[in-house]
From Swiss-Prot:
Signal sequence segment: none
Domain of life: Eukaryota
Active site, per annotation: D67
Protein name: RNA pseudouridylate synthase domain-containing protein 1
UniProt gene name: rpusd1
Any GO BP: enzyme-directed rRNA pseudouridine synthesis
InterPro entries named in the record: PsdUridine_synth_cat_dom_sf, PsdUridine_synth_RsuA/RluA, RluA_PseudoU_synthase
Species: Danio rerio
Molecular function via GO: pseudouridine synthase activity; RNA binding
């Protein structure tokens, strides 16, 4: 339960093109604020100064985002070409992610498919939040899908909670937090979506457990060790196991292997869909990652 520091950076995978780190909770990926000394970017610069790219504002290109409060697998590209390849995988929704969470209450159904559309909350005092379609002040809601699988029932600090595996099939901001809150089972320690009431846990209990990026020459799949175990947090007391995490991971990997084999089979050549100017601009902005120019 030690807080983040420059020294405690955990590397899950490293090559000449990518580094995947196990992001600590309560740390920003990057920041332009002078007072934000502890960021993943500063950790990377501290441990790998020779890998920083002087042509970018932060020195490193993050392939995706994790919230300040979320821990787990975070992929970093070490050059522009690698960033471009990763971008295509995310853009085409070919990346597979799975998260672990402790949520409030007892999730009675073992498997759930959530499809609440999510938009930006424009209500005064809540503009930093997202919300489900139909909420007053919900702007530009977009379709979102999350698969929920119950792992264990137990208690956290004496309160009923459920440990779940969350698989986002889309990538909307705060998607998992909003979806869990929408079904009446907010994530333990989610200060924002509990409207500042759930403030006793030392962290928000959301962890990016599994990440698979199907890069052509360097497919990446990593797991970030489960932090929600009694040996690491004595306040978490599992009482009944419903699904074994390792078995669910095997099922995910089996599906991935089948999908990869299907992709490897030759198909009739068809013209590639034309990328719009907006998509091309988004790609260039993402690749530049706040260029110094």
């Amino acid at each position: 339960m030690e807080p983040a520091s420059l020294e405690n950076l955990s590397v899950l995978y490293q090559s000449t093109n990518y580094i995947v780190v196990n992001k600590h909770w309560d740390i920003r990926i990057d920041s332009k604020m002078w007072y934000e000394k502890q960021t993943v970017q500063s950790q990377l610069k501290h441990h790998f100064p020779e890998l920083a790219d002087p042509g970018t504002y932060y020195g490193f290109r993050f392939c995706h985002q994790l919230d300040f409060s979320t821990s787990g697998a975070l992929c970093v590209a070490l050059n522009k070409a690698a960033a471009g390849q990763a971008y295509r995988c995310f853009k085409d929704r070919r990346v597979t992610k799975a998260y672990l969470a402790l949520v409030r209450g007892t999730v009675t159904e073992e498997n759930l498919s959530l499809d609440f559309a999510i938009g930006k909350n424009t209500t005064e005092g809540k503009t930093h939040m997202m919300c489900t379609e139909g909420t007053e002040g919900c702007e530009n809601p977009k379709p979102c899908q999350t698969e929920v699988t119950v792992l264990e029932y137990g208690t956290y600090d004496g309160d009923q909670v459920t440990k779940v595996l969350l698989q986002p099939l889309t990538g909307r901001t705060h998607q998992l937090r909003v979806h869990c809150s929408a079904i009446g089972h907010p994530i333990v320690g989610d200060y924002t979506y509990s409207l500042r009431t759930d403030n006793s846990p030392y962290r928000m209990m959301l962890h990016a457990y599994f990440l698979h990026i199907p890069l052509h020459n360097e497919p990446i799949h990593v797991t970030a060790p489960d932090p929600f175990v009694p040996s690491l947090d004595a306040k978490w007391a599992p009482l009944r196991c419903v699904n074994i995490l390792e078995d669910l991971l095997k099922n995910i990997l089996t599906k991935l292997q089948a999908a990869m084999q299907e992709e490897a089979e030759p198909e009739p050549r068809t013209s590639s869909p034309v990328e719009s100017e907006e998509q091309r601009a988004q790609c260039q902005q993402w690749l530049c990652e706040w260029s110094l120019e």
